[in-house]
Structures are given as structure tokens and as C-alpha cells.
Amino acid sequence: MKKKKLLSFLLAGALSVSALSIPAVAIAKANEATKQTYVPTISSKENTMKIDLLSGQILKFASNYSKDYADKVIKDDLQIDRFAPTPAKLTWEAEDGALYYTLKVSKNPDLSDAQIFLTFTNEQSIEDLLMGTKYYYQVVAQFENKTVKSQIFSFETSYLPRTIEVEGISNTRDAGGYYTEDKTHRIRQGMVYRGGKIEDGTEAGKAKLLNHYGIKTDLDLRAEATASPLGPTVNFVNVSGPYYAGTGDSGTGINSLADSSKGPWKGTYRDALLEEIRTFTNPENYPIYVHCSLGRDRTGTIIFLINALCGVGEKDLFMDYETSFFSRLGRADNQTASNMVNTPFQGLYTYVRKYAPKKTLAEATEMFMLDIGITQDEIDSIRSILLEEV
């Protein structure tokens, strides 16, 4: 009875625990366990081994993406968050009488570095999985006088934007997970997060950024604050970042940085963008949370430049940007996705593309960065930190 009360307490606090949190007796019994032929199954919309971590309008948008598709999916003017991630739900079948189950979930076939969940039922919801990633799992059923262990099974998450839920903060997601155009690499996940202003976050939300996502750098592109809402333990980079590729003499776009005839703020915005980009050259700065106010314009510009530099293709770059319109802040100024995608964001893409129209977008972005003063060593550093082979 005491053991059941202890497990109930653990489950009430948090289902995800480390191996050290499991009672020693259970570990000893699990080590002696023999394989048994009961079959865990995955419950998903299509009842397949592919799990969608999005649902509703955002799932329809991301699964069938084409430019300015958001306005065709969203049929109202409500400024609400529509892209909360959907947990994966694992279920399994076992003989009656189990006291509790231990579920191990890992990205590794041998279940090393596994997340461990304890549950009294034959199902478990798992939050915050990575996009486009294969996972392995095993269920261990603990009975009064025996331990029954399943074989190792697997499932894969769909290649859809990895949105995250941070209480109080809108427009939050992982900027990684996307493949390069040649499919040889992808952007590491859990390295760069993007979203809206942090000060909107509850204490629980800010604690989640610090403790769950491990944020080490708050890259604030508004130049309005003197300290991070996340506290003194994070590296605070605060600049007034340029956005898009402005027209006329606005001087606010990245096209003004390399052309002395554009706008009075050329030097200021150039220095700001250099500091933004150089934040990504230091491995000690990661994970980074990048934001402006809405998490769409200044944030969208720097995320475009970093991911384009690393080789992400046009479709994924546009989809990541347009995902903002499924958030409360992304629509806070009543702009439509169609207008913003086809005018300022398309202008940003076109401007960078012109640096090397016959080469890849990654090469064109590299040439732009070299033009404004980023060095080749700094470019190489960003790529080495953010890219992983596939």
C-alpha cells in the first residue's frame, strides 16, 4: 500500500521521471524480467506508426502547405493561439493484474537516454516530442510477483513544425528540425526557439523556458529592455533588429545595410544585425530564445537568414514564417498572411536570392552575410553548431 501511495504522489507531480526515481525493488525485478508476447499499440488519428503532433487547422495547413495558405485555412478574424502541440498517445495490452507500468521512450534503438514514465493504466500521453523523428519504446508491467517486459517497438513523428506550449507566451516554436535542400543534413532541434515577448509569460511559463528547454540566451530584438525577464542567469542580447528588405528610405530592412544610400539608420541596423548573427556563432549561447514583440517580423527575418544560411529550402522557410499567423500575436496587428507573405517576406527572400541567382539560397545568404561584415569563420561556426547529418 505504501508503494502505491508513493507512486500516486510521483504521478501527481510529474509523469516524466529519471531512472533514479524508480523504486530499487522495481529496477531489480525489471532486470530479471523475461520477454512476454503482449503487444503495445500506438493510438493516432490514422491508427498508424506515424504520429502527428499537430491537429485541427494548423495540421491541415502544414500537411498541405503552399504559400499564403494560412488565409485559406483560417476562416475567422479571431486573434487566438491555434497551434498548441498534440501529445502522442501510446496504448498497450497486457494481462490483468498489473500494479503499474513503466514506459521507456528513447530516440535510440537500445533505449539509452530514455524518458521514463510511470502509470497505473495501459496508456500514456507523451508531450514535447521532436518533429520528423523515430522513437523506440518498451513497456514493463509490474505484477505482485513478476515483471513482464515487452519487446522494443517504434513510432515516428510527422515532418511538421515543432510548436511548443509556454504558458502566457504566444507564437512559440522550435526553429529547427528542417532538412537542407540536398537532404544530407537538418537543423538541430532544441537549439533555437522563436516566439513572442517573454514578459507575457507566467512564472510557470518562464520557468519552463529556463528549466525544461534550458534557455541560455535571451535574444531580444526590440532594444527596449535592460534585463531579461528570465533573470540574471541567462545571457541577454538586446538590439533593435532590422526586418525584411524595406522599400524607399525606411532604412529598417536588411537591404539598407549594404547600401549607404538607404536610410539614416544604416549603421545602427547593420551593427544590430551583426550582433544578432554573431550570437549564433558561439556554442556557449545555446539554447537560444529569439523574440521581438510579436515573434513575426524581426524574429522572422533573423530566423530566415540563419536557416537559409544552413541550407533550408524555400518551402520550409516560408512555412515556418507563415506558421506565426496561427498564433494570437502573429495576427495581433490584423495583418493577413497573404499580404505579409507575398510582400515583405517575399521581398526579403528575393533580395537575398539576388546575391547569387544561379547558386543555392545558402550560397546567396552566405554572400550577403560576407557583404555586411560577417566572416567566413563565423559562417562556418553557425553551420557546424546547427547542422546535423542525416
Give the location of each predicted region.
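Gram-positive Sec-dependent secretion signals
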Residues: 1-30
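Ser/Thr-glycine-rich phosphate-binding loops at phosphate-binding pockets of nucleotides
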Residues: 294, 298-299
